A protein has these predicted regions:
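Conserved N-terminal entry element of GNAT/NAT acetyltransferase domains
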Residues: 1-15, 32, 161-187
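Conserved acetyl-CoA-binding loop of GNAT-fold acetyltransferases
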Residues: 136-146, 297, 316-325
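Acetyl-CoA-dependent GNAT
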Residues: 37-94, 104, 110, 166-168, ...
Length: 331
């Protein structure tokens, strides 16, 4: 999963996040609200195994603000259509700023829209009135109170409050028409196939001697969506997908003079013609940079046609610099 809205990002936890999760989970001040004032006492090795386990029913997510990790979320299926979620803002300097409600809303919207979920549940401790206020403001409905249902780390009996949310109950704390970015799902293949020809057509007009109007190979799209280390990030307003960025992790080739680097390659960036000029290209580039950083890339690389001045200006504004020039001689 990869979601981006404003300065906030929700992304899959990766192996490189194990040490950070270990620090948070072993911190009693972070875990006290969950009933573990002494921390979990876990290890980086155990967390690495959990993240690596494809059979683990818990989907672990990292929360970022301005590309800085600030906390974590998770969700797991109780049944095919019901997801249980949890959230912790772990860095104290990012707490009580209203970020939690936005992040919960981002995740709930995504689960309802693109993951087949029709019901979301969560619980919190009875004394956590602030969390209850946040949940109820987002549309969650209290479904019950379980008195003295578990003992915390100190042996104290605790009472839990249960909540549920249905799609029609979700109250977004932001304008639902604001542009945002999410990672593509298999069901998005058709819209991606429809946008691709607009990119190829524009490129063919710039360099018709080398590029022609065409459709993209559906197998290429499917592999990028489903294979690890690859992604298609979609720019969306409301329910309408308006553009995408295709990115994958790779490595410098094994050539003796090359300094070895893991890096991300932005293969394609496309925005529908009618939606251009509204900042969607910038939004996608920023999301791709965040994706690349999270995946351990040392840098993000892309190519541009030499006469595509609009694209070149965009890339330079976003911090890209020229590295290699390709020369071609007609024979």
């Amino acid at each position: 999963m990869y979601l981006a809205l404003h300065k906030l990002t929700i992304r899959d936890a990766l192996l490189a996040d194990a040490s950070l999760l270990c620090k948070w989970w072993n911190d009693g001040t972070v875990m006290a609200h969950a009933g573990f004032p002494q921390g979990l006492g876990t290890s980086v090795e155990k967390i690495t195994q959990q993240i690596s386990d494809s059979n683990d029913p818990t989907h672990r997510l990292i929360l970022e603000c301005q590309n800085t990790p600030i906390g974590e979320m998770c969700y797991r299926h109780q049944d095919p259509n019901t997801a249980e979620i949890g959230i912790k803002i772990c860095e104290s300097n990012w707490q009580e700023q209203g970020l939690g409600s936005q992040l919960i809303a981002m995740l709930c919207r995504e689960l309802f829209a693109n993951h087949g979920i029709t019901r979301i549940v969560l619980d919190t401790m009875l004394e956590n009135h602030r969390a209850q206020h946040v949940y109820e403001k987002l549309g969650f409905v209290k479904t019950g109170i379980r008195e003295n249902c578990w003992r915390d780390q100190t042996g104290k009996l605790r009472t839990a409050v249960d909540y549920q949310l249905l799609p029609q109950q979700l109250c977004l704390p932001f304008d639902e028409e604001e542009p945002w970015v999410r990672d593509a799902q298999p069901a998005d293949q058709t819209i991606i196939e429809e946008i691709y020809p607009t990119l190829f057509e524009a490129m063919s007009q710039l360099q018709p001697q080398y590029i022609q109007a065409a459709k993209q190979n559906p197998d290429f799209i499917r592999k990028i969506i489903t294979e690890n280390g690859k992604d298609i990030l979609l720019a969306q307003c409301g329910e309408q997908v308006l553009g995408f960025g295709v990115v994958l992790m790779t490595h410098t080739p094994p050539y003796n003079c090359f300094v070895p680097h893991p890096y991300a390659d932005l293969l394609d960036l496309a925005v529908l013609p009618a939606a251009r000029g509204n900042g969607l290209g910038t939004l996608l580039l920023q999301a791709v940079k965040g994706w690349a950083k999270a995946h351990g890339a040392d840098y993000l690389e892309l190519g541009a046609l030499s006469n595509n001045q609009g694209a070149i200006r965009l890339y330079e504004r976003e911090g890209f610099g020229e590295c290699i020039k390709t020369f071609r001689a007609s024979l």
